[in-house]
Amino acid sequence: MVDTEDEPKDVMVLSAIAKGYNTEEKITKATGLSAFDVAIIVERLILHGLIVKREKKGFLGRRKVELTITEKGTRELQERRFELEQKWQRMVMLAEQGKRQEFEREALSMRSWIPIMLFMGIMDMMMWMTMLNMMNLAQQDYMPEQVPGAGGDMGDAGEGGGWDWGDFGDVNI
C-alpha cells in the first residue's frame, strides 16, 4: 500500500475483509464508510493484489460477489497492525509519563488512524478519552469526524417515562 490520505480507510476495509465481511455491502455497514468509498478501495486493493474478488452463484441463481484476502494482504495487514500497536503503546507511555507536548504531537499525527485503531481493537474509546482528559486536551481536536460509533449510543435512554419501582419490578408509563 502507498502512503496516502486514503491509507487508513484502505487498512480498515482490508481488516473488515479479514474479519469475514466479504461483500461490499457488509463492509459498508461494518466500517461506516460510504458505499462509493468502499467500491473504490476494493478496486485499489484488488489492483495491489491484497484481495481477490470471486463470483459465486447465490440464491435463485443470482450472482454473488465475495471478497477474500490474499496471503500478501494478510502480511500487509499484520505489518500495519504491528505498526499501529507500537504507536498506540507510545501514546499510552507518553500519557502515563505526563509528557503533554509529545503526546499532543503524536495524537495529532495519528488523528486519521483513530477509526482503524478502534475498528481493529488496538485502542479502546474509553481509554482514549481518559488519556485526553488526563492531558487536559479538547476531545474534538483529536477525533476525526468519521469515527464509527463515536457519537455515543444511548441505547434505550431515549424512551423516557420508565420508573424503577424497586422490588415491584419496572413499570413503564
Regions inferred by a protein language model and the residue ranges of each:
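Short amphipathic alpha-helical interaction segments
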Residues: 30-48, 53
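Long low-complexity, intrinsically disordered regions
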Residues: 171-173
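Short, amphipathic alpha-helical interaction segments positioned at domain boundaries
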Residues: 64-107
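Short alpha-helical segments that sit at the start of domains
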Residues: 1-12
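Short helix-to-turn junction characteristic of helix-turn-helix DNA-binding domains
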Residues: 14-20
